[in-house]
Amino acid sequence: LLASSAASDVYKRQTYMDKTGRNGLRIGDLELDGWEEKFNTLTNKHLNLINNFNVDIDFDINKLIEEFTNSINFIKSLRFIDSEHYLNESLNNGKKILGEGAQGSLLDIDFGTYPYVTSSNTTAAGACTGLGIAPNKINNVFGIFKAYTTRVGSGPFPTELKDEIGERMAKIGNEFGATTGRPRRCGWLDLVILKHSITVNGVTELIMMKGDVLSGIDRIKVCTKYKYRGETIDYLPYSCLLYTSPSPRDTDK
């Protein structure tokens, strides 16, 4: 409800908190009498949070409520279904379903570069919890990756390029966050991270994108190992907060 370009991340987290706090407003609630009361309770909760934390956000609550109400009226004109029942019935009838994840594996709340992650499961397992489909119903997992590495916002990035090559990748690859519009950080392909992602997702096929972005670069490098606590490792360490750096011998390929 109270989302704005300056505070979208804040309220996205509040939405996750509503869910895990078991007081969120769900689509199915719109078919029940009294959903407006639940909505008003949540609205007051978030307004109190803003006041308590003294957050400086410019918004018109009445305008936001009006926009929300108009959206609800449109949603209620649609047919509501139990999505997990619909999807499983489709599978039982021989239909094929393709699910698409919206975020990278390293943003996963459990297996990503915590705490620089999102608030949900972005790995293939998230398709099960998000859609209500059992793990044994998934036949193939397509791992889609870029020929180089990108990241939006803060967090560890061992192969990041803070030079003209990194800027070139961002410009040619049009690397801006899909939701926030923030420029993405760019760097060489990190095979350690890629291997980790393949493992935790159970990837069966790999698809590489944006190889053309690297056209014209005389020497293309990849990272195959990390220097970590004086040792050379080829896996993602437990904590991303501990210092890791690409091994020069293994990135110079």
Go through the PLM ranges and name each one:
Residues 1-7, 11, 243-253:
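Single conserved hydrophobic/aromatic residue that forms the stacking wall/gate
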Residues 15-78, 82, 90-94, 102-245, ...:
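Catalytic core of tubulin tyrosine ligase-like
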Residues 86:
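Basic (Lys/Arg-enriched) interaction patch that binds polyanionic ligands
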